[in-house]
């Protein structure tokens, strides 16, 4: 069995997307002849909340090595909170120690935190071990250029300059790129002439049914809303960045029109936006609430910027009448949460760019109501379509999801990990 060292500053018990993606991979890599070693950070150095129960989702025999990080009590004075930056030195020391004493066949680095990708090139220079960078989110992005300066993150200009300087260095000797969508890796390849699409593979998050099986056996009590209060609860769980605000505005305009045309029906709606901020402490502006007030539906919308744990987010999905998925002004944006939304077996409303892979996934699985927009016809021109979809769901509130779970098998986390194993095999000249 070959060995892959997976470097991820965020890992279980963290509930952040990179931690979940790594967990999905390591749960299935042994099925395909790969022994994973996870190199990560000690939980006490995480800035955000974490959930110890997430550890029940790990395999008992998983090998995990944890290192320290610089405390935010010190680094925040320098404007640094990113766990990747705070643990970079400690991770590099551990990489040198592991690669000097163990036979490591390949290295996998999921990003974000994106600065961690430099460890791939550093390890390659020292040990000649081929490395793969796995893009969950792009590091270099122009998405914030399309939004007003007042809505951009305060340190975006500095972060943008850092990404454009460090990313090409980190990718210079990369053996392979993987990403949650082809659009993500295509944008990277377009920037750097030494990369080729033959060295890139699309690997969506995938659907892990075992997580829902665990939750149904160990249900949690969510405190966001009361399932017995008679309202029609629609939930969106996850970050809502400025690049998504145009879609949010279209949704709110549709509800506003619905309140005008069918007040009795639409007044039952309660929209919940949970975990909308990447800020570790959740002390972020309530942009969604602001947009709701601008549309005069503020009393129907509840925004909680602080992230909830992974298992609590799944419980919210199970308890909601309808689940909501929203696209952004990046046409290839793919919401990884599409898979748990389908597995929750709840009615689903998705509003996405026609080029997003979410369109294919929902089409193949027959997973709910889908409203698409394009470069020529943005979300603002689809308000009527959104209103019609909402009205249909409100009038059939007891309808069950008709998702094709058999079609979802091609997107299982095991199937996605098989793609990763093929990549690792190709760069180590086996299989």
Question: Where would I find each of the regions flagged by the language model?
Answer:
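N-terminal subdomain of nucleotide-sugar transferases
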Residues: 1-65, 176, 258, 263, ...
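Acceptor-binding helix/loop patch of EC 2.4 sugar-transfer enzymes
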Residues: 9, 71-81, 98-102, 129-164
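Carbohydrate-associated surface elements
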Residues: 183, 206
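Conserved donor-binding/catalytic core segment of Leloir-type glycosyltransferases
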Residues: 225-245, 252, 416
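A conserved catalytic-core segment of Leloir-type glycosyltransferases
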Residues: 38-101
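Nucleotide-activated donor-binding/catalytic signature segment of Leloir-type glycosyltransferases, i.e.
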Residues: 268, 272-277, 282-307, 311
């Amino acid at each position: 069995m070959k060995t892959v060292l997976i470097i991820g500053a965020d890992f279980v018990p963290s509930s952040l997307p990179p931690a979940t993606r790594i967990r999905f991979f390591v749960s299935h890599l042994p099925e395909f002849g790969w022994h994973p070693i996870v190199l990560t950070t000690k939980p006490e150095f995480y800035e955000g909340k974490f959930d110890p129960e997430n550890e029940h989702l790990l395999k008992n025999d998983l090998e995990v090595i944890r290192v320290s990080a610089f405390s935010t009590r010190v680094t925040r004075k320098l404007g640094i909170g990113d766990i990747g930056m705070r643990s970079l030195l400690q991770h590099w020391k551990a990489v040198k120690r592991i690669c000097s004493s163990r036979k490591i066949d390949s290295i996998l680095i999921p990003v974000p935190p994106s600065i961690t990708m430099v460890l791939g090139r550093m390890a390659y220079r020292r040990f000649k071990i081929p490395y793969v960078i796995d893009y969950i989110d792009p590091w270099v992005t122009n998405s914030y250029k399309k939004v007003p300066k007042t809505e951009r993150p305060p340190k975006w200009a500095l972060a943008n300059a850092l990404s454009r300087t460090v990313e090409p260095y980190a990718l210079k000797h990369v053996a392979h790129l993987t990403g949650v969508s082809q659009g993500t890796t295509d944008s990277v390849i377009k920037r750097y002439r030494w990369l080729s699409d033959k060295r890139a593979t699309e690997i969506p998050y995938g659907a892990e049914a075992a997580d829902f099986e665990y939750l149904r056996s160990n249900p949690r009590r969510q405190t966001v809303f009361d399932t017995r209060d008679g309202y029609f609860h629609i939930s969106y769980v996850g970050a809502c960045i400025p690049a998504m605000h145009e879609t949010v505005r279209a949704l709110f305009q549709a509800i506003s029109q619905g309140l005008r045309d069918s007040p009795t029906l639409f007044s039952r709606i309660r929209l919940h936006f949970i975990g909308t901020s990447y800020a570790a402490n959740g002390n972020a502006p309530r942009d969604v609430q602001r947009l709701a007030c601008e549309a005069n539906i503020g009393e129907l919308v509840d925004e909680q910027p602080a992230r909830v744990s992974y298992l609590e987010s799944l419980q919210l999905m199970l308890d909601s009448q309808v689940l909501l998925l929203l696209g952004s002004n990046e046409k290839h944006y793919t919401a990884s949460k599409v898979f748990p939304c389908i597995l929750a077996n709840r009615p689903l409303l998705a509003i996405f760019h026609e080029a997003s892979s979410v369109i294919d996934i929902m089409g193949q699985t027959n997973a709910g109501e889908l409203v698409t927009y394009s470069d020529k016809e943005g979300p603002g021109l689809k308000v009527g379509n959104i209103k019609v979809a909402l009205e249909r769901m409100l009038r059939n509130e007891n309808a069950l999801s008709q998702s094709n779970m058999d079609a979802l098998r091609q997107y299982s986390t095991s199937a996605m990990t098989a793609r990763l194993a093929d990549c690792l095999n190709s760069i180590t000249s086996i299989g």
